Amino acid sequence: MNNIPVLGIDVSKDKLDCALCVEGKYKSKVVTNNAQGFTDLLNWLHKWHVDSPHVCMEATGVYWEASAEFLAAHNLPVSVVNPAQIKAFGGSRLVRTKTDAVDARLIAEFCLRMTPEAWQPPSPAEQALRALVQRLDALQRMHTQERNRLSVAREAVRKGIADHLAWLDKEIEALTKQIRDHIDGDSDLKQKHDLLDSIPGVGERTIAAILAFGASPDHFANARQCVAFAGLNPRQHQSGSSVNGKPRMSKVGHALLRKTLYMPAMVTLYNTAWGKVFRNRLALAGKPPKLIIGAMMRKLLHVAFGVLKSGQPFNPALHGA
């Protein structure tokens, strides 16, 4: 356990519940989750003569990003941890009450006892790419919704829906080009893109997501951490001889990154030589199709991490094993 001040932050869409621990004593503060709230938080820390506490928060959707980037830009060490870690820590502490204030204090206790590694903020180019990728995903989801509506719509509204679909098609096409131009215009992103593009089965959308959400050695110490970040790590449920549940994907992690790996996993398993070898090996071992798909999603992230770390393109002899 360290003795430096720690600041646990429970993040929600509209507010940040903060718990500051200094020499074993806790102080609480609630601020809005916007630029003014971040400034208020800094002023509150200065009021208590705390200039550089170790800040810890959960990776809750996208709501944590702005506050983490603001605090890191003001030279505060920030750790962003998987919510599953805090949940497990709370279970070990027998915490039964769940409120935002209690969660903030629990996060502070976790930071104090576990001293998690500092989070590395994304570069401006990565931040811009992330915004573009998230916008593209929103447009594609909107397109799917409108297409489903059109199939059952009454004649009175069909033209309006069709016009909206045509507009969405143009926006998606333009945004897809903007994403590619953005990657091509940044030397670091372009180099990483070309390495990821060497992996059979991985397409432009998946490459953009991996680069946008920092699923790389720049932000994680190893591939296992990267897989856990995406929520692709298997979760075992076993106890004694009476409880022996099947391993399942944890899904505690970045949903958009996980979603973008599903179709590439299918393509790789059925349309590439190395993917077919992987599929046949697991099928012969008696693994069901759903498990094989999840395993390939994890494998793709492991391979992506490997080519980025080594700086060498995909090698079927090395990565296909």
Regions found by a protein language model. Give the residues of each.
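Nucleic-acid-processing active sites and adjacent nucleic-acid-binding tracks
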Residues: G24-H54
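Short glycine-rich phosphate-binding loop at a beta-alpha junction
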Residues: S52-Y63
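Low-complexity, acidic/Ser/Thr- and charged residue-rich accessory regions of DNA metabolism proteins
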Residues: S241-S242, F278-A321
